[in-house]
Amino acid sequence: MRFLLLSVCALILSAASCKEDNAEPEIPVIERRFTLPEIDLSNWKVTLPVPRSDGKPLEVEPPEILDYATDDTLLPFMYNDSTDGSLVFYAYPESSTTNSSYSRTELREQMEPGSNNANWTFGQGGNMKGTLSVPEISSDSDGDRHRTIIMQIHGRLTNEQRDLIQEDDNNAPPILKIYWQDGRIRVKTKVLKDLNASDTEILRTSAWEDDEGRYFSEVVGTEQFTLEVIVSAGRLEVKMNDSESFVYDGIHMEKWGVFENYFKAGNYLQTSDANAFARVKYYDLDISHD
């Protein structure tokens, strides 16, 4: 019996040894903790802190922007971070845009890909929602951290409005600017300087000014947070983390209804200090219109 057991054991060990000798080497399984961001860029163009030959900042529109992950021009400023599943927007002072002295790596909504001419009004409504963080940002000479704009709603004149007030371009003020500022989120909107201004006068940028601004109570620091912007006729709402909300629905929003608008998102660094920089990470970003 002892001989039989030893023989059986020998056969088992021999078979196991043959299996190990002949088997293909095992490929280690690497668990992917994060997937790359699924952000649809089909209706966005991006402005980069890179000057063109005419001095204006470089812009990349659809469909070229869809290749950002392999585009040598875009890669330094807009790239995937597979360690946390984000789309990174990197900016530093280099090339400013019209009506601003600051640089940006910022998305601009295009309802018709490749064109700035199709936009929306408050009456038509819109929604933008994103989850993001600001993990890195520089400080000034006093040690205070710089700030950056992470979301906007920008106004735009129609061609008829532009011609009516004899402007050279279609630019109108941003009705909404959302800042990351010293670890907190600050919201600023525009208000009319004169509520009795005529329908023609309110088309001018000079007719509007910033309100005092409001901070959400939560301190986000460098951690992730979610922002949602909800627009309807005469009303603007900004929500953070589905727990706190600012609503603007007074006369200023009613008057704003004359403008066209478009959403913006990314990293609009609010300084021209040498060696300044910021990285903003978006984990998701969605826009929709009724």
Predicted regions and their residues:
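Short strand-turn-strand beta-turns centered on an Asx-Gly dipeptide
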Residues: 239-244
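Bacterial N-terminal signal peptides
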Residues: 6-14
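Short, aromatic/His-centered strand-loop micro-motif at the edge of beta-sheets
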Residues: 189-226
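Bacterial Sec-dependent N-terminal signal peptides
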Residues: 15-31
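Short tryptophan-centered beta-strand motifs in secreted/extracellular beta-sheet-rich domains
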Residues: 128-130, 223-232, 236-238
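Ligand-recognition surfaces built from glycine- and aromatic
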Residues: 33-41, 46, 50, 125-127, ...
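Secretory/extracellular carbohydrate-interaction modules
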Residues: 69-73, 78-195
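Positively charged n-region of N-terminal signal peptides that target proteins for export
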Residues: 1-4
